[in-house]
């Protein structure tokens, strides 16, 4: 069978968790970064500090890690910052843009910090995992790419996918599509879907009404 690898990263936890579970039955590897990764770090018993983490799904993530049999690839380092809750509440993007960044191993995330992008070692790990892939689905950015200093992971993944030789590369989701377009890579992908919700439903294995109707046409 041809290698199928997938990168999932998003704040839409419920749907993304379902996507990951569905992809584990089809993909050779599922690479998880962005906000979703911290729920899986927590599931491994790691400190995540103030990083976005959906506690209601930690136990579910533990189950996915157990059934994945090594298919799930998680970041090994992250770009973190320390910002006060008050500054974040007042102006999140402004606060993190001014904050000093620190690259830390995922096992050493400080309780007062939050991860906002994957680190350089993770970028190299993901690029290595993508080598030889024949089909790749990318959904969601690797970090807070709206702020330049936290866009390196997203840019690196986008560039790596755009330059994969002989691979079918599909972007599902508005943020990923926006990142690819902003980097001028929109013509380097096999297909870009800007319908984030519909893309996620399809990746969950659900039937899309429009597609179903088209399939029924004789």
Residue spans of the language-model regions?
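Single conserved hydrophobic/aromatic residue that forms the stacking wall/gate
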Residues: 1-9, 13
């Amino acid at each position: 069978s041809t290698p199928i690898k997938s990168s999932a990263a998003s704040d839409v936890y419920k749907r993304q968790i379902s996507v990951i579970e569905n992809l584990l039955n089809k993909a050779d590897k599922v690479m998880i970064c962005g906000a979703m990764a911290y729920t899986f770090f927590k599931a491994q018993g790691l400190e995540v500090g103030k990083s976005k983490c959906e506690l209601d799904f930690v136990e579910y993530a533990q189950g996915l890690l157990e059934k994945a049999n090594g298919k799930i690839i998680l970041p090994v380092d992250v770009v973190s910052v320390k910002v006060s809750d008050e500054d974040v509440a007042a102006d999140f993007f402004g606060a993190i843009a001014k904050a000093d960044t620190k690259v830390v191993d995922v096992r050493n995330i400080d309780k007062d910090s939050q991860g906002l992008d994957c680190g350089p070692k993770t970028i190299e790990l993901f690029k290595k995992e993508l080598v030889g892939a024949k089909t790749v689905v990318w959904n969601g950015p690797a970090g807070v790419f709206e702020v330049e200093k936290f866009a390196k992971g997203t840019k690196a993944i986008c560039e790596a996918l755009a330059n994969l030789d002989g691979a079918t590369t599909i972007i599902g989701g508005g943020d990923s599509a926006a990142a690819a377009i902003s980097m001028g890579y929109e013509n380097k992908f096999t297909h870009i879907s800007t319908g984030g919700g519909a893309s996620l439903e399809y990746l969950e294995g659900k039937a899309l009404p429009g597609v179903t109707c088209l399939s029924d046409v004789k």
